[in-house]
Amino acid sequence: MGAPALPPLWTALAIAVTLGSAVTLERWLRARFAAGKLAFGAAPPLQLPINDILAVFGVLWLSVYWPGGIWFGLVGAAAIAAVLRLHRIPLRRHFGLGTLSVWQWIGLSLWIAAAVFVPLQLLAGGCEKAFEHFGWPTPHEPAVDLFLHAEGWRQLALLFFAATVVAPFGEETLFRGFIQPLLRRQLPAWAAIGITALVFAGLHQHLLTLLPLFVFGIVLGLAYELSGSLLLCIAIHFWFNGFTALLLITGYGPQP
């Protein structure tokens, strides 16, 4: 069942925030490019022996079978950090942890999330309408079902933490912090970003949201490629998942 409409005032506010964020962000990016302060290649490529790459993915594969969906991201992040340390690759430099100040990555991530959240929700709604038109099933994402069937505020709080902290940290470390830099070593930026975004969308195993998640993956990949800051990607992902979770909690997301 589709999501109920927001009250008119909230709808108008969401549109105003989206348009304002998108227009000002586009102008800021254009000015930064023109001034030579922004360019592709800020994120360092990564080269590792094939055995170590396979070991990371082997650990990820095993973690899928462990109880609790959060293990996949956390175990993956731990395995990646261990491999990087093994090869004496500084985590701070590789993940760009000092590239932006705290206020810069918080503010910029909120700016980007505010610009893309509503368009991606509209794209997801369009995909749902298309599926319904062709008579294809439109099941919820597993994570959405967990929110819809949560029992009590304690379980909701745990789900909110998993969605806004654990998932962004684990997924961004894996996709933007590991897979994209590995591909970037051999491929141009656009190809590395696109392939990583496709894998990111596909591993969510939800055909209905494949296109919106792919576009979101492109946004995250561009953010990492242009800033070199994994924290920026984690924060964008935090805001996006947080906005989505708030819609579900307040009853304005998909219905059971």
Regions flagged by a language model, labelled:
Residues 72-77, 159-162, 213-220:
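Hydrophobic core segments of transmembrane alpha-helices in multi-pass, intramembrane catalytic enzymes
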Residues 1-104, 245-256:
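N-terminal, membrane-interfacial amphipathic/helix-forming hydrophobic leader that caps
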Residues 190-256:
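Functionally important transmembrane alpha-helices
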Residues 61-69, 85-166, 185, 254-256:
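Juxtamembrane helix-loop-helix connectors linking adjacent transmembrane helices
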Residues 105, 118, 122, 170-195, ...:
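Membrane-interface helix/loop boundary segments of multi-pass membrane proteins
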Residues 67-75, 154-155, 159, 184-196, ...:
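Membrane-interface starts of transmembrane alpha-helices
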Residues 59, 79-84, 112, 116, ...:
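Structural signal for membrane-spanning alpha-helices in multi-pass inner-membrane proteins
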Residues 20-27, 161-185:
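Transmembrane alpha-helical segments in integral membrane proteins
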